Amino acid sequence: MIDALEFAKGLNPQPVVIAHHPSRSAKEESVFGLTTPAELRRWNDAAPNIAVGMEGAPGHQAAELRKADDRGSYPAWVYARGAYGRGFPTMGGFDQMTAIVGGFWDAMLGEGRRWWITANSDSHIHYTEGGIDFWPGEYSKTFVHAEKTHDGILESMRAGRMFVVTGDLITALDVTLSDGVTSVGWGETLKTKLGSKLTLEIAVTDPEETNAAGRNPLLNRIDLIMGAVTGPQENVDLAQNPTTGVVERVSREAFEGVDGQYLIRSELTADVNGYMRLRGTNTDSLEPEKDPLGEDPWSDLWFYSNPVFIELID
């Protein structure tokens, strides 16, 4: 893979490489299989402008929707969400590397790496045609804030200007972090002084329309997750960032707005080099739970934003 990344660095335009279903072969929490933290760090070290992230929500999540009399063509483990049935399951439809607060994703962000998440259908064969997949965009979506050009989309993916969502829980998300002088959004870095008062503004759309399942899920809560950036770590297998946690939970009752258009504000203080990211769900679960076999994917929906960084300056 490193040879391939070195070759790709010479291409014009350069591609974007995303690690797919990174924990499908993991046997336990933080006991990884074919894809390890060390391997993903090597990719990012070799080509930080190409190997920029991983699949947060894997595809293959429609197996449970197949007709009961049409299940003999696949082994039982395939019917877990994401086909994660041979080891550690998905959590709210997301890979453990993304879903666990203070886990691998936060370890990468805590090193200051610009390491982003995406979601896709991995659509081989639709579940109505004998497969276990949704059509592209039917269930999982990656929203990219970009000019509608090939170059613009690749540039924004490299820069982390993306959020991911399942089941059309939300259809728009804007994040602005400001110290009163400078404002930044996803993937960007706010350079500010120690002790600066910061304002985080979240604009979100919870659509008043049905998704592909004919349902209209309600966004129940948004979580603000923050962690410290402490720099590169010697342990290349590190998959934890103990500084990361949920610092605020905003319930639907506290949303300001009408007709599904909501604005949420939070006041913060710049006290450490760090980052913040958002997560939301239609469930009452404080954290995404391990997905059991037989779960209806449309009932357990989440969104995740990519992070905004804070860098303290003199």
Locate each region found by the language model.
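The substrate-binding groove and active-site-proximal loops of carbohydrate-active enzymes
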Residues: 28-33, 84-98
